[in-house]
Regions:
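Extended, compositionally biased low-complexity polar/Lys-Gly-rich tracts
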Residues: 81, 88-94, 114-117, 130, ...
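PLD-like (HKD) phosphodiesterase/transphosphatidyltransferase domain
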Residues: 1-101
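HKD-type phospholipase D/PLD-like phosphodiesterase module
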Residues: 97-144
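Short catalytic/ligand-binding loop motif for oxyanion handling, primarily in non-cytosolic enzymes
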Residues: 39-41, 100-104, 157-159, 166-167
Length: 214
């Protein structure tokens, strides 16, 4: 697989989005399956919303949401996802967590699950589901130690991590491995069906819903 990082990965992701926008919106869907985090994300150090949340006793209030919106609304993903939402393209994010570790989860993981991802989903127009790894395994779904993302006609992108942050991306349409592409398509569609049937649809912060001042 050809792994891209940095500006090359960002440029290729931009091409995938443009492919989505160039096709019939009614035939498009976007799905993200996020693997369970195992490392503290280095980018959280000094990230203002995370620090504001910590100062507020690990609780999100209007100031936390406002800080988050001010920082993230300019992000390319938020802009592209909002454009997709305006075109009626469904966007689903599925976050995998280990039930056995959740009650003793570190603060950074609770921030990701309870603040960061719900805020991204609200601003981007996503549906956000939380699923337990143990339930996925019981249902016969195989583990992934990387993210699997479907960008409609733009194809599937895999994303791997180092020090808790995305380190590389692979665009399967570029590699021509039909077997791998087929397996990942099956996986992401199975995870979507599983999340709808047995996952938790996460309530998103109303402060960031469409129609809010953000």
């Amino acid at each position: 697989m050809t792994k891209l990082s940095g500006a090359a990965a960002d440029a290729r992701l931009g091409q995938a989005w443009e492919t989505v926008f160039s096709q019939d919106s009614a035939a498009q869907q976007i799905i993200h399956v996020l693997t369970w985090p195992t490392e503290y994300p280095a980018w959280l150090t000094g990230f203002p919303p995370f620090e504001a949340w910590g100062r507020n006793g690990d609780e999100a209030d209007e100031a936390v949401w406002r800080t988050f919106a001010e920082i993230t609304i300019p992000w390319p993903y938020i802009r592209s996802a909002r454009r997709a939402t305006a075109l009626g393209i469904p966007n689903t994010r599925i976050f995998v967590l280990k039930r056995s570790q959740w009650q003793s989860a570190p603060s950074w993981l609770r921030y990701l699950a309870q603040v960061h991802l719900p805020a991204i989903a609200a601003l981007a127009g996503e549906k956000l589901y939380r699923v337990w790894l143990e339930d996925c395994r019981s249902a016969g779904l195989q583990d992934r130690d990387y993210d699997v993302n479907l960008f409609g006609a733009g194809g599937i992108m895999l994303a791997g991590y180092h020090n808790g942050d995305v380190d590389w991306r692979v665009f399967l349409a570029d590699d021509g491995d039909q077997d791998l592409s087929g397996r990942e398509h099956d996986f992401i569609n199975s995870m979507r069906d599983f999340a709808v049937a047995r996952g938790e649809l996460v309530k998103l912060p109303p402060e960031l819903h469409p129609g809010s001042e953000f």
